[in-house]
């Protein structure tokens, strides 16, 4: 065994140097934690131009887990194993040391199952579909997640690790093209010369592996377990949650990760050896815990393999590592001679002269290749600006071999600490700018978030503008003049049916509730209700506009920023701002400096950086140059959140000379009185408070900015007090799930809206399960969290439920400790319990919903919610947001009583929360909340009843129209009619093109929202890109939509065609006399004027020319 020493920060550089000098040799670099493995992999891609560098990730589940790992991780592991076995050249593999213990499929397995595709190769869609299913890919209606594929027309879309989307276009029996596409937008981005597809899982379900599973299952567990759902799923060729824990049963033998390389040299340190031993202890503990849990329930369908069946022993792996050719590394910070010569760390200590020190070092080392390594784009840009100010030349690089001498090279490289060698000097921006955690790129933009809301399901209540509330039954095709046409079938009172052509789908709106009374077709009751509500909406709209106008009339002195101090404050931010954060900050800056009062809502998920955005706003105002003693008030709903914000503000604003105080129930009456006096005199710059701040005795000296955090938690009287402040104060509201009233005002443009939808780097979605209470699953969940070193929340809706929960926990997990917190305890006692939970003095916090705001504990990542059906949608969402806030996956279990019948309303809430798992879905939740409860009375606070008359979507539309009317904005005004067009053509989306009914309805709804010809053409391009060439029936539909847009312009209410020409009927209130007379004069031999605003145009027509003919007719009418 060879031993080497060098600075820890140079580990990857050292490994790459070895790898580069021995290109035919395989290497494994094993490290002690997953984060380091991924970072070293990214560094290696920079340091080396060799493509044979691979990363093998660890599962994000625990040993003997009943849940499956993240699909991206599973696919990435399989992809890496495939590349290792199919690539004969020298390779470098980077991984967590514990992965060396994994038993993996035999090493020859992946060489049989990978696919290499390229344009012009002979391959049919059916052949590829069958092979993908056999390779553990899941066929779906649309491909969104890793390991999924979708068949659409002549196209197969597939999602591979990254995640990256690929679109394979077929022509008969060969592949025509392969393109990469954006998973969010589904739009192609570039062509690919070839595509290698590895199995999507380490377990491939085919006749051979299923046969092995049957035999090995019988050998290990003695019986077939034909009533076992896991067993039944596997022998049927279906995946089952957690079946990865039985991997050895699927193969005749297993290999280790080392076996996948050719006599590799293993590079490791003592921490790696320790990680191997710790993992062995961990999986042995989990085995004992799982065995104990299995005894609690008869016929548990997760049989438990022994540790030696699932893993290699630590002693065997350690012995392998210590063989003579392997390298044990240790670290020193002083200069060391090594294979790469003189490596040493650089330390920047004098922070006040950091950049002067930097350029002294650069001057002394200008004979070397100097590389400044930035972690993210924002710091990269900052460093670039600084270099320019010092008048140095710089060179932007992506790989080390692009570096030049006699210039400063800069690149985005994840390096932690500076170091130098004989040839290179590496300097990190993290030391220069004191950066810490990074953020990833934008995950979902506003457009995508809003598109998620646009769904319509069979059986849902809908509203027709003219006929009222009905129930959408299904899409149904009928023949009209011998041609198929898609219609929406709507059920009305008395079993009456209404069929709406899909090109007029915009007249159908979602009702937004599970409870509704069907209207009767032909009844005048609907129009009376609609007219009555329209008058009330007019009153509301007028009032809202007056409020908004009053605020705009209150001219505010533009805030003059202290730019030098503000730049310093921004530079102290320990993260890199996300794109959405920067957009929100710029929005606020514009609001504060434009001379009008700000009224803005920031909607962003928990942990997505709303607080920092608010702090920027606070700084802009509190340090403004043109205000005398400006004050900022931050209002929060709970004492816990108040304390948390106060601590963060004190730390963040340190050194800027601002006096910050908090006012809540933990503050004594005497101290509170002093704070109020200081507020009134202007001595306090920033006050953070709960409802204690909303007191009639609270007076401000010069309140310029009011920030309302978690605004959905404030009650009527509290908001009345806030209203009294708002008419002369800038207002910024923040929420993950805004109350429907605030959301409505934002969506109608009366309140400005900024959305932060960018998750932190490596944030994983919280896995959410809705289930009857099951003690075995609860025990498993709590022990899983305990054994991975974390803590758990157990939430009770009511204090009286806590006694039962305590009894259950004593029986289920007697080995774990717990404490209780609820609102009837004194604030000091709650603080004491919370402080102990923060530092990990006990395992489980049993609490009421008081934790839904203000709790941020990275180690607490499991939550059980008792009687979840009794909680509101936004409450459930906020509670779930307490977990999974770091880089560890969170697990939420929403339990319901097994013997209780759940109402359809409650069930809908639970379905929404379970399905809204994507990061940044708070806006979606708020909109669903509006669907369920209604936007309510926008002037007062009642959130029920009024919207019931017409439903959410139509109410929203009527309000927008009324506001537009009052503001003389004609853009969104309601059309007085909807053109009906009958050209005798087949009009529908064929099942062969889009087979999924829900997706098809979503596309129809999008078509209903197209408002001009350019939008139609863009939509058409998107469809061709996603699904292939348009079938004639779909093309007819889009052509008719364009014709319909022309009909709006010409006030044509009906357009019918026959063999001998067209019949046009104009809208009764439209004055088209001049146009008609001019047209008749020009085409006197072909036209006739009929009663009831009808115009007949005579011309022999054939199907293939009818679209062209009608377009010529309408454009002629338009241009006359």
UniProtKB/Swiss-Prot annotation:
Couples transcription and DNA repair by recognizing RNA polymerase (RNAP) stalled at DNA lesions. Mediates ATP-dependent release of RNAP and its truncated transcript from the DNA, and recruitment of nucleotide excision repair machinery to the damaged site. Residues 777-933 form the Helicase C-terminal domain. HAMAP family: TRCF. PROSITE patterns: HELICASE_ATP_BIND_1, HELICASE_CTER. In the N-terminal section; belongs to the UvrB family. In the C-terminal section; belongs to the helicase family. RecG subfamily. Its main location: cytoplasm. The keyword Chloroplast does not apply. GO terms for cellular component: cytoplasm. Its EC number is 3.6.4.-. Keywords: ATP-binding, Cytoplasm, DNA damage, DNA repair, DNA-binding, Helicase, Hydrolase, Nucleotide-binding. ATP binds at residues 604-611. It is found in: Cytoplasm. GO terms for biological process: regulation of DNA-templated transcription; transcription-coupled nucleotide-excision repair, DNA damage recognition. One of its GO terms (molecular function) is hydrolase activity. A motif (DEEQ box) lies at residues 709-712. This is Transcription-repair-coupling factor. Residues 591-756 form the Helicase ATP-binding domain. It holds the Pfam family UvrB_inter. It is an enzyme of class 3 (hydrolase). Signal peptide: none annotated.
